[in-house]
Regions:
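Conserved ABC transporter NBD signature motif
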Residues: 17-25, 33-34
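Conserved ABC ATPase signature
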Residues: 95-99
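Catalytic Walker B motif of ABC-type/P-loop ATPase nucleotide-binding domains
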Residues: 120-124
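H-loop/switch region of ABC-family ATPase nucleotide-binding domains
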Residues: 156-157
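H-loop (His-switch) and adjacent beta-strand-loop-beta switch element
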Residues: 169-186
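Conserved ABC ATPase "signature" region
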Residues: 58, 73-91, 116
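ABC ATPase nucleotide-binding domains
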Residues: 191-224
Length: 224
């Protein structure tokens, strides 16, 4: 997490040394082998042709199917159940390009979920989403990670969203690593100090919802 010019997306690519996935170097894995282990959720899907929502979600099974092999009935039922789980019930036959931006992003998230990959990479997935959809998306992501003992690496702009949904925050400044924050264990004073060094003076408040759950809210102390 950092401002727009902090080269977050660049940091997703190794600049030196080797990158390992399940004890294998990325160079040793074919595109299909890599896709079987890793799912990717971009800022925008890039889908411009008319496809049904179900067809888009079924793309998540592509690495597991042989050439020209169609998805099985079980895969289709799982895809429909996943759409219901993320809040898009009865939308499977709707044109994907007619969805709102928030619904599109949830659909792409469902596409990643059906493949049950152990590693998910998300590049600013919340950038085009409103408050409701961005929180909904991150809660679904956290549920998936817990249920499948998976790992999600996410680049984010919203510090409050990151503080309340991520286990570990890696803070970048001008393309370099500034420090880490573990929201459940890092003292508030240390979080404020680190985040103030990149956002200007901020305060972090602890609030509780009606169910007693604690939330961290970052407040800008001075105007920019």
């Amino acid at each position: 997490m950092r401002q727009n010019y902090a080269f977050k997306s660049d940091c997703e690519h190794p600049h030196k040394g080797s990158c390992l996935l399940a004890e294998n170097t990325l160079e040793s894995l074919s595109a299909r082998e890599l896709a079987k282990q890793c799912g990717y959720i971009p800022q925008k899907s890039g889908i411009t042709i008319d496809l049904t929502v179900l067809d888009v979600v079924l793309m998540g099974y592509h690495p597991d199917l042989s050439l020209l092999q169609p998805p099985t009935a079980q895969m289709k039922e799982h895809a429909k159940a996943t759409l219901t789980m993320i809040g898009l019930p009865d939308r499977e036959q709707k044109n994907y390009n007619q969805l709102s931006e928030g619904q599109k992003q949830l659909c792409i998230l469902a596409r990643a979920f059906v493949g049950t990959r152990k590693l998910l990479l998300l590049d600013e997935p919340e950038s085009a989403l409103d408050f409701r959809f961005r929180n909904q998306m991150m809660q679904h992501l956290r549920t998936y990670v817990t249920a499948h003992d998976a790992c999600a690496l996410v680049t984010l702009h919203d510090p409050s969203l990151a503080l309340n949904t991520c286990d570990e925050l890696i803070v970048l400044s001008n393309g370099t690593h500034s420090g880490n924050i573990s929201p459940k264990s890092t003292p508030v004073s240390k979080m404020e100090s680190l985040l103030s060094s990149i956002y200007g003076t901020i305060n972090i408040a602890k609030l509780h919802d009606k169910n007693g759950n604690e939330h961290l809210v970052m407040i800008q102390e001075e105007s920019i």
